[in-house]
A protein has these predicted regions:
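A short SAM/SAH-binding and catalytic strip from SAM-dependent methyltransferases
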Residues: 108-124
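A short acidic, Gly/Pro-enriched loop at the edge of an enzyme's catalytic core
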Residues: 101-109
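SAM-dependent methyltransferase
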Residues: 144-219
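Conserved S-adenosyl-L-methionine
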Residues: 52
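A short glycine-rich, Lys/Arg-flanked "PGG" loop and its adjoining helix->strand segment in the class I
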Residues: 127-139
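C-terminal lobe and adjacent flexible extensions of AdoMet/dcAdoMet transferase-like proteins
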Residues: 209-255
Length: 255
């Protein structure tokens, strides 16, 4: 992925298998992040890019609130799923990376949710994305995203015992999930996610790799990309970021 501006590995099973795509929102329920970003964007109509939109839940929410929304994701299966959801007609959907975004009017805000920023594995990936977002933002526009704070070491809970969950899907019935086998290579954490479909006994595995970047390094890269200012929060209530204790590293970057 060196030099690309993809925000999620489009070849991972999680993003390519239609059964797992359909389960994504069930396993990632809750809207604390969406509520936080929506409050930062405000109620006045804005032109918004949802970068790495996944199943499109937040993009549809923004469109329903009256915003002009373009949503992109490098995984066609995610975009196909998003297009079939209620309210999808109000959003412009594109299966592409940021560098493949067609020319158009600048955006007032770019959002990247779901810890998608951590799929940028190299310095080149991060820098290309930050510079690319800066280019498509209008003066005074904002880039809002989050990543996990490496100091808290969230991966230590990605064990079968601590990560086990289950959902009951109308299409698939009961499905269990757990993480296992995490490995650390510098700033990159690799792990597997295992799925068990009770209805037919199907077992699926998706391998993931995430980058954990320190706030100091990320702050410098944001400014180097041409942003004038950045505010850091440490949780979805808006508390200031504390490197020792904050689980989240939430950025509001001003162009």
């Amino acid at each position: 992925m060196t030099g690309s501006t993809a925000v999620a590995p489009a070849d991972e099973t999680l993003y390519t298998d239609a059964r797992l795509v359909a389960l994504y929102d069930l396993f990632n329920a809750g809207d604390h992040d969406f509520a936080f970003y929506a409050s930062r964007i405000g109620r006045a109509r804005r032109r918004i890019l949802d970068l790495g939109c996944g199943t499109g839940t937040f993009a549809r929410r923004l469109a329903a609130a009256g915003h002009d929304v373009v949503a992109i994701d490098p995984a066609p299966a995610m975009i196909d799923h998003a297009r079939r959801q209620p309210g999808a007609d109000a959003v412009r959907w594109l299966a592409c990376e940021l560098r493949g975004l067609p020319p158009g009017e600048p955006f007032d805000a770019v959002v990247m949710t779901g810890h998608a920023f951590q799929c940028l594995l190299t310095d080149d990936d991060i820098d290309a994305t930050l510079h690319g977002v800066r280019r498509v933002l209008a003066p005074g526009g904002h880039f809002l995203f989050e990543t996990r704070n490496p100091r808290v070491e969230a991966w230590r809970t990605w064990t079968p015992q601590q990560s086990a969950r289950r959902v009951d899907s109308p299409e698939s019935g009961i499905v269990e999930l757990h993480h296992a086998g995490y490995e650390i290579d510098g700033a990159i954490v690799s792990f597997d996610t295992h799925y068990r479909f009770h209805r037919d006994g199907t077992l699926l595995k998706s391998a993931s790799r995430l980058r954990f970047i320190a706030q100091r390094d990320l702050h410098a890269r944001v400014l180097d990309a041409g942003f004038s200012d950045v505010e850091w929060c440490g949780d979805w209530h808006g508390a200031p970021f504390d490197e020792a204790t904050s689980a989240e590293l939430i950025a509001t970057c001003r162009a």
